[in-house]
């Protein structure tokens, strides 16, 4: 019974079903027609069903045969997928890589480009992408929810087992709607004026380590939103104030949706790190690390988001 489900048997059966002919299946597989016919007959005997109705000129799947064809095709696909995975693993290519991207560096365009180059380079690797805010990125890699973190914030944490290297920095701009009252206040704007308006904030997504607050004045109201795109839209509508990544502000300013203003004690650049598990030595991880070096492919993809020192 077990011999029925060999690769050779399943391939003979599915090929015969696709061509509707034992002779054409034999020609396709480089076998004799009698060998194909014998294999199918042995499978029918083992399964105790008729897989094909036969005529002098053609064969046709029975209802049981159609069901078995679907399952046999799935089994062959699984077999070939497993074989490809084993081959790649033996070459040091990870079967699966989980990437956590800091929301400051997450855009659909950049993430799609990242996946495009990774799948071109490593087509058999299963890639999962998630996004977190601030220390939520560290949380993901420390708790083994991610193998690689793109944009871990510049915070040194205890725990060990993590390698990291700088990939650039996010530069911040204080941005408000053109008709916001603060747009008409002399610069640099005093903190006493800033406190009068709510700060639109994206909450840190860390669960097991301390959450980080990006920028908030003492006594200032805060409005929490889930992501920086929502924060940007809220500030465009004049619902609050705050710092945004400069790349996001530049785009909004081209449409006259935001203006920038100078304030006392502006927010400093946020250094971004590429962090990996120390034990992650596979080819995908090493390739990503290499391509975030100067002139690397991934450095080029993220160059409009990150500032790098020359």
UniProtKB/Swiss-Prot annotation:
The keyword Transcription regulation applies. Residues 22-42 bind DNA. PROSITE patterns: HTH_LYSR (PS50931). The keyword Calcium does not apply. Gene3D superfamilies: 3.40.190.290, Winged helix-like DNA-binding domain superfamily/Winged helix DNA-binding domain. It comes from the Bacteria. One of its GO terms (molecular function) is DNA-binding transcription factor activity. InterPro entries: LysR_subst-bd, Tscrpt_reg_HTH_LysR, WH-like_DNA-bd_sf, WH_DNA-bd_sf. GO terms for biological process: regulation of DNA-templated transcription. Keywords: DNA-binding, Transcription, Transcription regulation. Residues 5-62 form the HTH lysR-type domain. Belongs to the LysR transcriptional regulatory family. This is Uncharacterized HTH-type transcriptional regulator YahB.
